[in-house]
Amino acid sequence: MSQLRAVPKQEWRRFFDGMSKELLGKRAEIEVSSLDLGDQIISEWVPMIGITYDHGDDLLDIALEGGNHMIRHPREIVVEYAPMGLSSVAVVDAEGTQQVVRLKEPLVLPPATSK
């Protein structure tokens, strides 16, 4: 059974910086869902380089081999944990578009700690 966890905005940078090394080379797909576009897979099982959040530009940068996918002004981030680890990251941007990064194999992360 999977578990969802909303990541508070003040933790975004630390959360993604902490997992970026573990993401290197992991295969991911990105699906974008909006009322205007419907559901579209924009990257299919491409090796990842990492994910970073830039507070100054309010930008989530998903680095993949062959190019980056940038989400400007993210409003909400929810991660899904499967029994074997983190399986997806769902991001809703300021316009209400949902973008989901799914990992082909769950990512085992150390337990989250709040500071």
Regions found by a protein language model. Give the residues of each.
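N-terminal leader/targeting segments and the immediate start of mature chains
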Residues: 2-24
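Helix-rich interaction surfaces within compact, conserved domain-sized segments
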Residues: 73-115
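Short solvent-exposed strand/turn elements
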Residues: 62-73
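Short, conserved beta-turn/loop elements at beta-strand boundaries and strand-helix junctions
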Residues: 52-57
